[in-house]
Structures are given as structure tokens and as C-alpha cells.
């Protein structure tokens, strides 16, 4: 991944969205697992940008199994630990917030690494919860909308109170069930051990910085566009999603991290709900260009079953923070295209 994983204007937008909360995190310390991942990088970049507004610097401990050659990790306010999060027993970093973003969220990758996927959501989560208790830090668990499985029609848009319709013995189960157990750990540490804790359930967050080999819909489509090849739509393309641009998602996540009073939050966009054919049409309209498409079967190295609909109820975010998604799907497509045209 090229080290320019973001649009500078996107980072400025996130920082501006959070301006009333800057003083609350001046001088704070953040431990971030999965620091080299898509969301982890955005958290670090945003915190470092906020650092420009104060002499009381925010400090970051960044943990990941590998790190790109990225300017983030060369900053004097960032300390790196290059190691598997499951194998770390001593962090030596007294912090205010622990953000557990480590995981394997891409279906192609967790299909090929199911055991590692499960234990990152369980072993590492327990270790970090124990550490949060020890140092009295607020713990944030990056879960997933996957924990809802394949909701029935009456539970879409899906509320945080929906218990899910999830199989424990399918290709996606390593990720879905791992996250569900991770959430259960958070629940009992919160009520039994009194750990300050919140959970994010992101719904189809996308934006600059997604790896070209991620295999989720936006990297896959835009990689094909860059190569002037038809985009590939799995099966009929009738499965629907709502998509949340990264600036809106990171803004919501920071709001919960800094000031969230509740336990579980859906993070995403509640409209529009699009099937892949409609997304293809919007891409052509937004970019003002003809883009060919073909329908294909799921590849052998990709889970053969996926939710048919995915759309969050984000009433909790709206009520608690007066939150609203600011970046439309049309604008999101333009921004992703602008970035991927240069870096894919």
C-alpha cells in the first residue's frame, strides 16, 4: 500500500467535525491494535492532525503484526510494537483509551485464515480487557455488522437490540462468531469487572486506504476500472448494502470513544440501500463514464454465503450526538475514484 492512504481534505473534514471535542483528548494516550489497518490508520492520522492544535500532545502506542512505510509511524508521538497482538503480554503503556481494531475483516482473507480470525477476536480481546481493567482505561471493541448475520425483513434497518440470525458452521462463521464472543467478553468485563467499554458495529465502511487486494466491493470495482476491465458482480447482484464513507464513520467512532454513554453502537449509513446493479449505475452517473459489468460465481477462495440485506438503524447515534452522515454516496464514489486512480 502506497503510504498516501488518505485524502488530506478527508482528514481535515474529520478534524473539523470533532472540533468541539478536541480539548477532551489533548494530552491523552491511546493504545491502538490493528494500527496498520484501514480504520486504525485513520484514527492515528486524525489524532496526529489534532496534535497540531496543542502543545499538550496526544501519545499513541501502535500495535500490528506489520507496518507499511508510512509517515504516521515515524512521528515522535507514535510508538510502534511490531508483533502479533495475540502474543503480547506486557504493553508498558499507561493509556486513557484502548482501541482494539485488530482483525481480519475481508471475507477473502478470513476465509483463508479462519483460526487466526477467531482468536484475534477472543484471545487478544481478553488480554486487552484485562489491561484496561488494570490501568482503568476505556476499552473500545471494533466489532462488525456481521454479528447480525442475515436479518429477516422485519429487522431491517437493524437495531442494536437485534440478536442476529447467524450460523456457527459456515464459511463466514470464523469472523461472525469470533466477533460475537468478543462482544460477550466486553459485556461481562463491563458488568462484572466494571471496565469502561463500548462496542462499534461498522456497516460497510469504505474509503481511500482500502488495500487493492481487499476483495470487498469498492476495492474490487475500482481496481477493475483502473485496469479498464469490466467490474465483477457476484451471482445475481441482488444483495443490498448501505455504504458509509470513511470520514463519517471515523467521526462517529471518535464521538463514541470520547463521549459515548452507551454500550453498543451501529456505525454506518441508513440510506440509500443499494443492490450491486444500482451501485454500478450510480458509479457510472457519478463518474460520467461507461463502466461494463459481468456477473460471476463466487470464487473458490471466497465465502459462498453472504447476507442478502444489510442496513443499520443509527437512531442511537443520531439522538445522542445529533449525528448525520454528511458525504453522499455520489460524492463518496468520486472521492474513492480520485484516490484509487492514483494509488491502485
Regions flagged by a language model, labelled:
Residues 29-49:
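N-terminal Rossmann NAD(P)H-binding glycine-rich loop of SDR-like oxidoreductase domains
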Residues 144, 183-208, 219:
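Conserved beta-loop-beta element that borders a ligand/cofactor-binding pocket
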Residues 85-120:
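NAD(P)H-binding glycine-rich loop region in Rossmannoid oxidoreductase-like domains
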Residues 174-181:
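Active-site helix of classical SDR
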